[in-house]
C-alpha cells in the first residue's frame, strides 16, 4: 500500500469529483483483496480484537462472559442510534424453540413470544438455530436480540419489522432469504393482535422507529431491501454489518413526497459492503446521513445515492470500484435534473478511492462544516484503517463462557 498516494481534482464550474490516482492499480487491488481474505479468517476465529481501531469492538471485547446480561453493552453504541438501550433494564429471556411459529398466539420460548412482551428483555439463544417465520416478526419496544454465543439464522420466511417502536438493539444475527408474507393477523403485544397487509420482504423494516441499533449482523438475498428505514424513522445506527448478494441494499427515506423524513438521522459505520451487491448502500431521501469508515468492495450500479435533497456526509470510507469503465462513480443523484441536484449537500472527506472510483460532490462542498453538522455523529478514523476497522463485520463466532 506504500505506493498509494492521493490527488484530489477540482473541476471548475461543475460538481466536484473526488478521485484518487494510484501508481499500480493491480497491486493495490490485490492488496485490498488480501486484506478482505484476512478479515474473513479472523472473523471465523471467534474473537474481537481490541486493537482494530473499531470503538464498538474495543468495548465489546471487554464485556462479561457470554450468557450473562451486560447493561454496559448498550453503551457500546455510537452514532445517531447511540441512545438505543434495548433491553438493558430487563431480565434475560432465553429462546429455546426455533419452530412452532404462531403469529397470533406465540409459544413461550420462541423468538416471537419474546419480542412482543411489554417489558424490557435481553433475548439470547440456547443453541444454534434457524428460525423460519410464518409472518413478519413485529417487535415491541425495549428489546435486545443478542445472537452472540450461537449461530442464529432468520431466513426462508418474512423477517423483522420495527413498527412505531423504539429502543431496539439487534446484534449478531444472520438474516437472509427473507420473503414477503401474506395478509394475516399478527400479535404485536401480549394484549393486542391485528390485521397486517402483505409485507415487503425486507430483512429489517423500520417504520416510524426511533433509537435503533443494528450491529454485527449479516444480511443477504432478501425480496426487497436488506435494511429499510422509512416514515419518520430516526436516531438509527447501522454498524459492523456484512452485506452480500443483494440488489437494493438499504433505503433510508420513504419517498420524495414524504417530507416527514426531513428530520431523519442515520449513521452507517464500520460495515463491509461485499460481493454480489448492486446499489443503495445506502439510498437516501430528505434527511441527514453520516456514512463513515465503511469498506465498499463491490457494487454494480453505484454505492451511495439519493433523491429529494438529502445531506450525505461521507468520511473515511474505502471505495474499490468495479473494473467496468462506466461503473466507477460511487454516487448517483436520482430523480432530479442536474440543475436541482447540483445544490444537494453531498461531500467526501478523507475517503480512499481505488481502481478509478470517484465521488461526485455537490452543494456546499467539503469545507462547509456547519452545513454537515446535523449529518455528523462521530469522529471518522483515517481511511487507511478501514481494513482493520471492518475486520469483524458480521456476526462474530463467539463461544459461551468466554469473552468475545
From Swiss-Prot:
Gene Ontology CC: one annotated term: extracellular region
Tissue and organ expression note: Predominantly found in the pistil where it is found in the outer five layers of the strands of transmitting tissue within the upper two-thirds of the style. Found at much lower levels in the anthers and vegetative organs.
Cofactor(s) listed: Ca(2+)
Gene Ontology BP terms: pectin catabolic process
Pathway(s): Glycan metabolism; pectin degradation; 2-dehydro-3-deoxy-D-gluconate from pectin: step 2/5
Listed GO MF terms: metal ion binding; pectate lyase activity
Cofactor note: Binds 1 Ca(2+) ion. Required for its activity.
Glycosylation sites: 37, 191
Enzymatic class: lyase
Protein's cellular compartments: Secreted
First-listed, main subcellular location of the protein, grouped into a coarse class: secreted
The enzyme's E.C. designation: 4.2.2.2
Catalytic reactions of this protein: Eliminative cleavage of (1->4)-alpha-D-galacturonan to give oligosaccharides with 4-deoxy-alpha-D-galact-4-enuronosyl groups at their non-reducing ends
Keywords attached to this entry: Calcium, Disulfide bond, Glycoprotein, Lyase, Metal-binding, Secreted, Signal
Residues the entry annotates as binding Ca(2+): 200, 202, 224, 228
Catalytic machinery residues: 280
Family affiliation: Belongs to the polysaccharide lyase 1 family.
Functional note: May have a role in the development of the transmitting tissue of the style and/or in the events related to pollination such as some aspect in the facilitation of compatible pollen tube growth.
Designated name of the protein: Probable pectate lyase 18
Annotated organism of origin: Solanum lycopersicum
Amino acid at each position: 500500500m506504500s505506493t498509494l498516494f492521493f490527488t484530489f481534482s477540482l473541476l471548475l464550474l461543475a460538481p466536484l469529483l473526488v478521485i484518487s490516482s494510484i501508481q499500480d492499480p493491480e497491486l493495490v487491488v490485490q492488496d485490498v483483496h488480501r486484506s478482505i481474505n484476512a478479515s474473513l479468517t479472523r472473523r471465523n476465529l471467534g474473537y474481537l480484537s481490541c486493537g482494530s481501531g473499531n470503538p464498538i469492538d474495543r468495548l465489546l471485547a471487554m464485556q462479561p462472559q457470554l450468557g450473562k446480561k451486560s447493561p454496559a453493552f448498550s453503551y457500546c453504541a455510537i452514532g445517531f442510534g447511540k441512545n438505543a438501550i434495548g433491553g438493558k433494564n430487563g431480565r434475560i429471556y432465553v429462546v429455546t424453540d426455533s419452530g412452532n411459529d404462531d403469529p397470533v398466539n406465540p409459544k413461550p420460548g420462541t423468538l416471537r413470544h419474546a419480542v412482543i412482551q411489554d417489558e424490557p428483555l435481553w433475548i439470547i439463544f440456547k443453541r444454534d438455530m434457524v428460525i423460519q417465520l410464518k409472518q413478519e416478526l413485529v417487535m415491541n419496544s425495549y428489546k435486545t436480540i443478542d445472537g452472540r454465543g450461537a449461530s442464529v439464522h432468520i431466513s426462508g420466511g418474512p423477517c423483522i419489522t420495527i413498527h412505531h417502536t423504539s429502543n431496539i438493539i439487534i446484534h449478531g444475527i444472520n438474516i437472509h432469504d427473507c420473503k414477503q408474507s401474506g395478509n394475516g393477523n399478527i400479535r404485536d403485544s401480549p394484549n393486542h393482535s391485528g390485521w397486517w397487509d402483505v409485507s415487503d420482504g425486507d430483512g429489517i423494516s423500520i417504520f416510524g422507529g426511533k433509537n435503533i441499533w443494528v450491529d454485527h449482523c449479516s444480511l443477504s438475498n432478501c425480496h426487497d431491501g436488506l435494511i429499510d428505514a422509512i416514515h419518520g424513522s430516526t436516531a438509527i445506527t447501522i454498524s459492523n454489518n456484512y452485506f452480500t448478494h443483494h440488489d437494493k441494499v438499504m433505503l433510508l427515506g420513504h419517498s420524495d413526497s414524504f417530507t416527514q423524513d426531513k428530520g431523519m438521522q442515520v449513521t452507517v459505520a464500520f460495515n463491509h459492503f461485499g460481493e454480489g451487491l448492486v446499489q443503495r448502500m445506502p439510498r437516501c431521501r430528505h434527511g441527514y446521513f453520516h456514512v463513515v469508515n465503511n469498506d465498499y468492495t463491490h457494487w454494480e450500479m453505484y454505492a451511495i445515492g439519493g433523491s429529494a435533497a438529502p445531506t450525505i456526509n461521507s468520511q473515511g470510507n474505502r471505495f474499490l470500484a468495479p473494473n467496468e469503465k462506466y461503473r466507477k462513480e460511487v454516487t448517483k443523484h436520482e430523480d432530479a435534473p442536474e440543475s436541482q441536484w447540483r445544490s444537494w449537500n453531498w461531500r467526501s472527506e478523507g475517503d480512499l478511492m481505488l481502481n478509478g472510483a470517484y465521488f461526485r460532490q455537490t452543494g456546499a462542498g467539503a469545507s462547509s462544516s456547519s452545513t454537515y453538522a446535523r449529518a455528523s455523529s462521530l469522529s471518522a478514523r483515517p481511511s487507511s484503517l478501514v481494513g482493520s476497522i471492518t475486520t469483524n463485520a458480521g456476526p462474530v463466532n463467539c463461544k459461551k463462557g468466554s469473552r468475545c
